[in-house]
């Protein structure tokens, strides 16, 4: 029997023995769910008792939505805390009567793909993406492999806060099975997405695997299609995941590409849902360039309806104007791949992504996939018969763009920063002064305790000037 759920109108529900754990858990007053599930420092926000309850309520909510009981798939990255959180969530899910298929170490897009292809009830990934090792997170996917809607996330949180009641309290234990063999299906799908005739022989590629989720699969993918592969940070290491490596620290990849005289390199983040590239000269090829190259290829093949690309407010003006010169349309969304995804579904766009390297191509799937993106870019380089460096040279010139982060520990201050009128006044002053010469974006990070300040201008001098002014204002008014 599938339990039905109801809200308690402010009354604490006490309809299941699992709620006896509530005394062990102190939840922050602000919402647990951010832009990418639940994320925080392990031992503070994220604990085993909380993960147990998250598993239980996620199982109840997904079961109620589906109307039937099907398995839930769980994957994880290499963090030291990932085993603990995965097992605690599994315990909660099986308490809710859900069958669990555990994949072990795998990329986030693997969970999304297998959830969709196996018609599972949902998927869960234990990862804090690009965050440092002491953090971790819990990402949720619905049966379509899409990130969980705000409505369903809100229901899970209502259960955690004791504001959701089960109409049926009967207990039917679920079973947990370790199924790493399922990962092979994802590996095959990634290669199949570029066609069976792909051959990257002659390309020397450096992969920075960030001590994370891609260490087993990414080298195998590129070796299978004929590339010469050199790997950095290529073991699962929970102490070093993302530390001075991966997509947020490209220095070691840049040096390796130059020293090894490689054609190009790719850097993944901890869960491999995003990727950045480096050309043979050591220059960073970010998500804007990747979207431009892949988009132009699809446009020339007649596979990009209305020439439409979806990017975010972080996308460089140089990229936008270059794309428009090709005759394409360019839409911007708020930061976050879930916002890009929503705009793509709404408009029918087939390609979108973020400067940070989250790229979504609906021709091949519904989630951002670092390995798939890297493979398609490498195939595009091979097909073009010119180097990635040459493609960059003949694409577009970026406007100087500076991004600075200000650490703000107070969660409520970060959440309500836009109510700070003196800071808003400083931002308006900067926007007026910049006029058509650039852009300003101040926002709270959805995944880290940071206020991000981005200034883009026609000259580096102008960008530096207003960045320093705004960073000083954030520190003055929010700290």
Swiss-Prot record:
Organism domain of life: Bacteria
One protein family per Pfam: PGM_PMM_II
Catalytic residues identified in the record: 129
Record-linked InterPro entries: A-D-PHexomutase_a/b/a-I, A-D-PHexomutase_a/b/a-I/II/III, A-D-PHexomutase_a/b/a-II, A-D-PHexomutase_a/b/a-III, A-D-PHexomutase_C, A-D-PHexomutase_C_sf, A-D-PHexomutase_CS, Alpha-D-phosphohexomutase_SF
Gene3D superfamilies documented for this protein: Alpha-D-Glucose-1,6-Bisphosphate, subunit A, domain 3 (3.40.120.10), Alpha-D-phosphohexomutase, C-terminal domain (3.30.310.50)
Reaction catalysed by this enzyme: alpha-D-glucosamine 1-phosphate = D-glucosamine 6-phosphate
A GO term from the CC aspect: cytosol
GO terms (BP aspect): carbohydrate metabolic process; peptidoglycan biosynthetic process; UDP-N-acetylglucosamine biosynthetic process
Modified residues (Phosphoserine): 129
Entry coiled-coil feature ranges: none
Binding site for Mg(2+): 129, 269, 271, 273
Gene Ontology MF, one: phosphoglucosamine mutase activity
Free-text description of this protein's post-translational modifications in UniProt: Activated by phosphorylation.
DNA-binding listed as a keyword: no
Keywords (A to Z) from UniProt: Isomerase, Magnesium, Metal-binding, Phosphoprotein
Keyword check for Phosphoprotein: yes
UniProt function note: Catalyzes the conversion of glucosamine-6-phosphate to glucosamine-1-phosphate.
Family: Belongs to the phosphohexose mutase family.
PANTHER family named among the record's database cross-references: PHOSPHOGLUCOMUTASE (ALPHA-D-GLUCOSE-1,6-BISPHOSPHATE-DEPENDENT), PHOSPHOHEXOSE MUTASE
Protein name, per record: Phosphoglucosamine mutase
């Amino acid at each position: 029997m599938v339990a039905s759920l109801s809200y308690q109108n402010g009354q604490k529900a006490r309809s299941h023995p699992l709620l006896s754990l509530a005394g062990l858990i102190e939840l922050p007053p602000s919402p647990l769910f951010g832009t990418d599930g639940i994320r925080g420092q392990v031992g503070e926000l994220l604990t085993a008792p909380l993960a147990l309850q998250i598993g239980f309520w996620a199982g109840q909510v997904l079961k109620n939505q589906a109307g039937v009981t099907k398995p839930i798939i769980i994957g994880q990255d290499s963090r030291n805390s990932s085993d603990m959180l995965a097992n605690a969530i599994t315990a909660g899910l099986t308490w809710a009567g859900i069958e669990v298929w555990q994949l072990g170490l795998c990329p986030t897009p693997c969970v999304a793909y297998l959830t969709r292809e196996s018609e599972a009830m949902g998927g869960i990934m234990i990862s804090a993406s690009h965050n440092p090792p002491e953090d971790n997170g819990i990402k949720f996917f619905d049966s379509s492999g899409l990130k969980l809607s705000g409505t369903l996330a809100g229901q899970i949180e209502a259960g955690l806060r004791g504001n959701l009641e089960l109409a049926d309290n009967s207990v039917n234990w679920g079973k947990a099975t370790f199924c790493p063999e399922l990962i092979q299906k994802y590996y095959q799908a990634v290669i199949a997405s570029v066609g069976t005739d792909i051959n990257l022989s002659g390309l020397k590629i450096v992969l920075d695997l960030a001590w994370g989720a891609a260490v087993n699969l990414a080298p195998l993918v590129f070796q299978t299609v004929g590339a010469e592969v050199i790997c950095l940070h290529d073991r699962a290491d929970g102490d070093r995941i993302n530390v001075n490596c991966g997509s947020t620290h490209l220095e070691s990849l840049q040096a390796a590409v130059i020293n090894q005289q490689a054609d190009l390199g790719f850097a993944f983040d901890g869960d491999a849902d995003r990727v950045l590239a480096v050309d043979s000269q050591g220059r960073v090829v970010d998500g804007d360039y990747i979207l431009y190259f892949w988009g132009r290829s699809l446009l020339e093949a007649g596979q990009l309806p209305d020439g439409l690309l979806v990017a975010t407010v972080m996308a460089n003006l140089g990229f936008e104007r270059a794309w428009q010169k090709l005759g394409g349309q360019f839409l911007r969304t708020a930061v976050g791949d879930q916002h890009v995804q929503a705009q793509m579904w709404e408009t029918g766009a087939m390609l979108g992504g973020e400067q940070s390297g989250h790229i979504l191509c609906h021709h091949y799937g519904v989630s951002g996939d670092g390995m798939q993106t890297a493979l398609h870019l490498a195939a595009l380089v091979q097909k073009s018969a010119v180097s990635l460096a040459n493609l960059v040279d003949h694409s577009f010139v970026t406007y100087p763009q500076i991004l600075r982060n200000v650490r703000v520990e107070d969660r409520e201050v970060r959440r309500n920063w836009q109510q700070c009128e003196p800071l808003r006044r400083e931002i308006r002053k900067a926007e007026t002064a910049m006029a058509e010469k650039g852009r300003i974006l101040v926002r709270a990070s959805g995944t880290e305790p940071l206020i991000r300040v981005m200034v883009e201008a026609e000259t580096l001098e102008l960008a530096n000037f207003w960045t320093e002014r705004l960073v000083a204002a954030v520190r003055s008014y929010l700290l």
